[in-house]
Amino acid sequence: HRDELLLFDRLVGKGGAVQLPVIPVRTPGSRWISGHYCDEFAEAHGKTLVVREALGAALPLAGVACAIDRQIIGRIAVRAGGRPFDDNSLTEDYELGLRIGSAGGRTIIARILDRNGELIGTRACFPDSMTASVRQKTRWLTGIALAGWDRLGWQGNWAQKWMLIHDRRS
């Protein structure tokens, strides 16, 4: 969206990170597979992240449509030996979002309309074949539900722990 950078500039200093909605685009001819992803992301970015932010739990980043404040990424880098993006992680964007919360930052989910009434966000296509879908879901399940226990533990307040249960259910 043409206003993304302006919105990032306006909001990133207010919390530590900004996540714009990911607006799912269904791949023609892939109603069931691509459509399934569209439904999941619409649910996550339309409701779950909004509730998560309201509860004060850390927000996972989507890997697209996000901006991170330099000070918070610097704090994370210091804690991580100069490497804020962990290349050993299967879900580095998800983990980075939670680490922003652990470092004292707050991610803002910015559901804001432009002057024409259009949602400011990033459109994204999702896997459209069974093979690509299984590969993606396996990475997410392994990275969040299984490795997340060891990599991130169960830290945070009750809202954070509740959302970790939500994330890690399989």
Model-assigned labels for residue ranges:
Residues H1-R115, I120-R123, S129, R135-T138:
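Internal catalytic domains of large membrane-associated glycosyltransferases
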